[in-house]
Regions:
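Charged, low-complexity, helix/coiled-coil-prone segments
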Residues: 1-4, 29-41, 131-136
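Extreme N-terminal tail/first-helix region
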Residues: 1-20, 141-154
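Hydrophobic alpha-helical segments typical of transmembrane helices
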Residues: 6-9, 54, 90
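Short secondary-structure boundary/capping segments
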Residues: 12, 36, 56, 105-107
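A generic structural signal for nonpolar/aromatic side chains embedded in well-ordered alpha-helices
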Residues: 14, 58, 94-95
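Charged, gly/pro-rich active-site loop segments
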Residues: 72-154
Length: 154
């Protein structure tokens, strides 16, 4: 199977809407935040308030990590403007569809901003038929490496 097929399966497993932990860091101060995420156009999208520390951390250090279940993602975040700006129309539509309460409470707040994370690497553990398959996806070089992890019972 080629990288594009693994990439499609990877994004399909994340789902169009999910909750993930976002890890940010700046000047030796790491933090982790549970985020409501949308997955589309090869990226992971979320929103936050410009008043929160994670906004400043991303502004100063766009390297972030995300985690959902047994999937770990490293990527680069960009700040994409207010959720209701024209360029974020798809984001706003999907927020309204999947998270109408969050959309109503937060998307209209002036200080809200959309965050787009482009994955660079991912480690995706899949547990099937007694084998742990570890998919190491390299989105930059468009490569995948699959490891089988067998835990020996001592």
């Amino acid at each position: 199977m080629n990288f594009e097929n693994y990439e499609k399966e990877f994004f399909d497993r994340l789902g169009e809407s999910c909750y993930m932990v976002l890890a940010t860091s700046f000047e030796d101060h790491p933090m982790a935040s549970m985020m409501t995420c949308l997955v589309f156009d090869g990226a992971i999208w979320m929103q936050t308030d410009k008043k929160f520390p994670k906004f400043g951390q991303i502004e100063n250090n766009p390297k972030v990590a995300l985690c959902k279940n047994a999937t770990q993602i490293e990527g680069r975040a960009s700040l994409c403007g207010h959720p209701l700006e024209r360029q974020n129309e798809k984001f706003a539509m999907l927020m309204k569809k999947y998270h109408p309460e969050s959309y109503e409470m937060y998307s209209k707040v002036d200080s809200e901003v959309v965050i787009k994370v482009i994955p660079e690497k991912a480690i995706d553990w899949l547990y099937e038929k007694g084998d742990d398959q570890i998919f190491n996806l390299d989105f930059i070089n468009r490569k995948v490496n699959i490891q089988i992890y067998k835990n020996s019972k001592a």
